[in-house]
């Protein structure tokens, strides 16, 4: 009995220690995004990707690829940063014995880290991180507690205007936002086109909030028989370049939507003014938009929605944690914005007049859903 009791006490002590360690880690959890952002700014991921001669590089070798680096301690500092990234599986790390008790860490790209390398189109996840780490967004979090107690949107409390209006006042931030949206769209749309086959057999497709038309450019490049209508605010589409098979139409989605065999709405558009997507808006706004889409579709038409799905019950799974964090970003930045559960999407679709919702495939933690008329 005594032995069993001792084992139970030891197990409880180990559990308590693990819980305390996890709590301590959470205290410094803000370190990761700042270190990752700085590493991207230093082009570390691209340096590792370009060096074909070696599978892994030391911090000193990585620094040698930075022509503007003048700090003699740069390699030591960088090694400590890369150690953190390796502990989160953003990099692979090997320890090499140099002799006399001296070791050297060497780093290479991991499967996760490759998403921060610029692809053949120059796109990566890096610019989206730059947006989330920008002071304009970061400062909103300092108002979260008071927003809970007193009301209001944290972003508005800091800047005095809605997030949709702010870029007009800050050209530098506007560029950061636009770059984030362009890169995010390119990365996600490529994977959508690889996995989703619902564009086949469409004759006409309307992209609501399509910005400069890049979504339709990518879609019609793969499906050249589709006639695309890129729909956004007039001042947005007037700057859109010409693409084969794509017409640019200006208007307000809350008033009406152009007709087509299908309507496309993807999470994150090309500029803040163009973020006409469901997670940016309240249920009332979304319902109004979806009713307009319903009117614009033929009897066999569909709305193709690309959005995250937030489960009703919290979970420690990475997919759920990621969506829950995005939900808080919406709450902190956008009036009425939020991530929704599958049940909430079905309820909105039903109230707007749609007969059903099909969840087709999951891409980059976003679900491609079809709302059928």
From Swiss-Prot:
Active-site residues, record numbering mapped to chain: 279 (proton acceptor)
PROSITE patterns reported for this sequence: SAM_OMT_II (PS51683)
Which keywords are on file for this protein?
A: Methyltransferase, S-adenosyl-L-methionine, Transferase
Q: Which residues bind S-adenosyl-L-methionine?
A: 232
Reaction catalysed by this chain? catechol + S-adenosyl-L-methionine = guaiacol + S-adenosyl-L-homocysteine + H(+)
Record-linked InterPro entries: COMT-like, O_MeTrfase_dom, Plant_O-MeTrfase_dimerisation, SAM-dependent_MTases_sf, WH-like_DNA-bd_sf, WH_DNA-bd_sf
What biological-process GO terms show up in the record?
A: biosynthetic process; flavonoid biosynthetic process; methylation
Q: Which domain of life is it from?
A: Eukaryota
Q: Which of this chain's residues are annotated to bind S-adenosyl-L-homocysteine?
A: 209, 232, 252-253, 265-266
* GO MF annotation list: O-methyltransferase activity; protein dimerization activity; S-adenosylmethionine-dependent methyltransferase activity
Answer yes or no on keyword S-adenosyl-L-methionine.
Answer: yes
Q: What happens when the gene is disrupted?
A: Significant reduction of fruit guaiacol emissions.
Q: Which Pfam families match?
A: Dimerisation (PF08100), Methyltransf_2 (PF00891)
The enzyme's E.C. designation: 2.1.1.-
Isomerase: present as a keyword of the record? no
Q: According to its UniProt entry, what is the function of this protein?
A: O-methyltransferase that catalyzes the conversion of catechol to guaiacol. Involved in the production of guaiacol in fruits.
Into which family does the record put it? Belongs to the class I-like SAM-binding methyltransferase superfamily. Cation-independent O-methyltransferase family. COMT subfamily.
Q: By what name is this protein known?
A: Cathecol O-methyltransferase 1
Name of the gene encoding the protein in the UniProt record = CTOMT1
């Amino acid at each position: 009995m005594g032995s069993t009791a001792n084992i139970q006490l030891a197990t409880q002590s180990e559990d308590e220690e693990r819980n305390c360690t996890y709590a301590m880690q959470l205290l410094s959890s803000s370190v990761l995004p700042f270190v990752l952002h700085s590493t991207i700014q230093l082009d570390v991921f691209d340096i590792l990707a370009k060096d074909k001669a070696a599978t892994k590089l030391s911090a000193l070798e990585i620094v040698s690829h930075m022509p503007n680096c003048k700090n003699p301690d740069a390699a030591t500092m960088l090694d400590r940063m890369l150690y953190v990234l390796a502990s989160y599986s953003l990099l692979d790390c090997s320890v090499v014995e140099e002799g006399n008790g001296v070791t050297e860490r060497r780093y290479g790209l991991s499967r996760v880290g490759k998403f921060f390398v610029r692809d053949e189109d120059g796109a990566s996840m890096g610019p989206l991180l730059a947006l989330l780490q920008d002071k304009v967004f970061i400062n909103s979090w300092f108002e979260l507690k008071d927003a809970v107690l007193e009301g209001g949107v944290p972003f508005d409390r800091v800047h005095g205007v809605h997030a949709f209006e702010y870029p007009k006042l800050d050209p530098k931030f506007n560029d950061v936002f636009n770059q984030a949206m362009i890169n995010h769209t390119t990365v996600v749309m490529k994977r959508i086109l690889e996995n989703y086959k619902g564009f086949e057999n469409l004759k006409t497709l309307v992209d609501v909030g399509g910005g400069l038309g890049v979504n339709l450019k990518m879609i019609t490049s793969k499906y050249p028989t589709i006639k695309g209508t890129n729909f956004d605010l007039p001042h947005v589409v007037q700057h859109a370049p010409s693409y084969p098979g794509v017409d640019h139409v200006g208007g307000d989605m809350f008033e009406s939507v152009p007709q087509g065999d299908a309507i496309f709405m993807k999470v994150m558009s090309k500029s803040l003014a163009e973020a006409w997507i469901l997670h940016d808006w309240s249920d009332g706004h979304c319902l109004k938009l979806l009713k307009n889409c319903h009117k614009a579709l033929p009897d066999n038409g569909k709305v193709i929605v690309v959005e995250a799905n937030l489960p009703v019950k919290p979970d420690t799974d990475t997919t759920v944690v990621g969506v829950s964090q995005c939900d808080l970003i919406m709450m902190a930045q956008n009036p009425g914005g939020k991530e929704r559960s599958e049940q909430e999407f079905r309820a909105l679709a039903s109230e707007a007049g749609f007969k059903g919702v099909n969840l087709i495939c999951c891409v980059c933690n976003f679900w491609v859903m079809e709302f059928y008329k």
